[in-house]
């Protein structure tokens, strides 16, 4: 039997007290009674997606110098110093690898909040202006043998509370309500370890999960329903390691895995089941889950494990264990489902990056990409330029452990690295004041959230 709730090991209540109330998540100070009435009206009307700030469209116009179908444009390993970063702080969580780290881009009220997954713990921090980290909440799963590999932020569609979804080796997806500091629900269905979870940007109740059982599952976090399963004759033939929703095409996503392929899937013909999942009142096991066996396109762009993939407009970024990230354009054959061609456009070299399960990340606007390597270095690329431009190479003499995953802040002014030795490394832009792309402060949390004197976690320079 899975544990009924996640045990909260430690919490700074002077930091999280406001987070746990409806004041920050749902209302302005002093208007709780009004909002309570509104919430009751919403419940009567039925659940709907929360009104969250929309993601801007990613504008990409990359034209290789050699032209399509010709030699791939490869970036030079010469830092341009367009943005210079300095190592700021180190925070050691323990001696276990940190497999996942991510900022909250779903809810702009918490744009400076990030979470990590290590061992059987999921820990939430805030990036402080002084360069340190503020510990907000720490959840420890009751299963001591659990090892979390992935996490993703989402939001409650009823009261807009921040939710954190995490999963790993024990095959169960945990949905944690960060406002109530309790486990909201557990999603069961996968037959193997879960390697990645992604949240739909415009429909945050929808998440997809990639598993060792060779399947991808689409879930409705609000109702706890497994809507669709993507596996079968045309599916992956080994562990699925990464997934990502298309930024503008609602029913499209990409997946990749140990079978060396990247697959593009469509759920448009089954969208009626997605809509049905929002109003389902029966037991989740009674929902008519559908299986999709054939992708729109299967691309053999790499010759080894593909452990990370992300959309860049209509293009795809994907990484294997061959010391590089590739940018390519998928061209599905509309007359022959599952077939088509690809044009590999650009190559972003990442020296000494031969380990698998090392993932890259981008800022909110997908302007820059950060990827770690085996030696504790992070390469920061200007991802939308052609030819690719290396912005900076981040290193620290003390950081020698592989960087499993990176997290780039909203505007790219802060870059975090999660290391194999249990350390979080932070680099900050030398002149962050020059950046003008931070989210509107009117959308930020009310004063006092994470701003208390006890918020500054001990950090080593």
Curated annotation (Swiss-Prot):
Chain coiled-coil ranges: none
Primary location recorded for the protein, binned into one broad class: nucleus
Gene3D superfamilies: YVTN repeat-like/Quinoprotein amine dehydrogenase
Annotated signal sequence range: none
Compositional bias ranges of the Polar residues kind: 18-37
Biological role: Polycomb group (PcG) protein. PcG proteins act by forming multiprotein complexes, which are required to maintain the transcriptionally repressive state of homeotic genes throughout development. PcG proteins are not required to initiate repression, but to maintain it during later stages of development. They probably act via the methylation of histones, rendering chromatin heritably changed in its expressibility.
Protein name: Polycomb group protein FIE1
Gene expressing this chain: FIE1
